[in-house]
Amino acid sequence: MFEQQPEDLRFYVKQLASVAVQKSEPSAWFEVLYTEAKGDTAKIPWAKLAPHPYLQDWLTNHQPFASRQKALVIGCGLGDDAEALAYRGFEVTAFDISPTAIAWCQERFPDSTVSYVVADLLAIPSQWHQAFDKVFECRNIQALPLNVRSSVISSVAAVVAPGGTLLLITRVRDTEAEPDGPPWPLSESELKQFENVGLQQVEKLVFLESELDVKQVRIEYQRHT
Ligand SMILES: C[S@@+](CC[C@H](N)C(=O)[O-])C[C@H]1O[C@@H](n2cnc3c(N)ncnc32)[C@H](O)[C@@H]1O
């Protein structure tokens, strides 16, 4: 999130997020940002218009079995990661809390097989409970403040089917102290919560982006049958 963004956009996002957090509506500012962008992707700090490179790398190196496998993309933004999974053969549902983001995905990919829906990660539909073979979570948890972190992690884990996997891409921080977000990178103890809610870590890669002073991880978790 916010990689190499102009200072004024970064400042604007921080302001929007700060007001939303003060009102205890931490997800409310995303719709404002998408609406105000008026179709200009340069105004969406995380929009790369391509799948995340660590997802691409995972798909290339793991060659996952995708036929009739149901995938869920959390906080799908403008849809590039969802499209990459669909291209590999997954039956993809992708959701975001922002109706404007979802409409934007449908406009960008009119022939897509992805089912794009508006939904709230903190109030997921009951039929999604443990329903997905592959869950992709990229840079959404870090975009929400620490006071909702446990609930967010529980919700992300809750949609993983028995035998299914979660692929997580996120920034991490080295201390337990509260960072000045957004983004709010995850701590070691927060990552541990995935295991406390029934998942087991299968693979973890750490990426240091020293020019940005950013540490990211890509972790694959599995829910045992
Ligand atoms: C930092 S962006 C990341 C988007 C995308 N995952 C990526 O990596 O490009 C966070 C996304 O999460 C969405 N979001 C925020 N709160 C949410 C919630 N409670 N439920 C679902 N989506 C949410 C936002 O609208 C936004 O598209």
Residue ranges and their predicted role:
Residues 1-72, 77-128, 144-159, 163-225:
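Class I (Rossmann-like) S-adenosyl-L-methionine-dependent methyltransferase catalytic domain
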Residues 139, 143:
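Short catalytic micro-motifs in class I SAM-dependent methyltransferases
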Residues 136:
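A conserved beta-strand element that flanks and buttresses the S-adenosyl-L-methionine
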Residues 133:
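Conserved acidic residues
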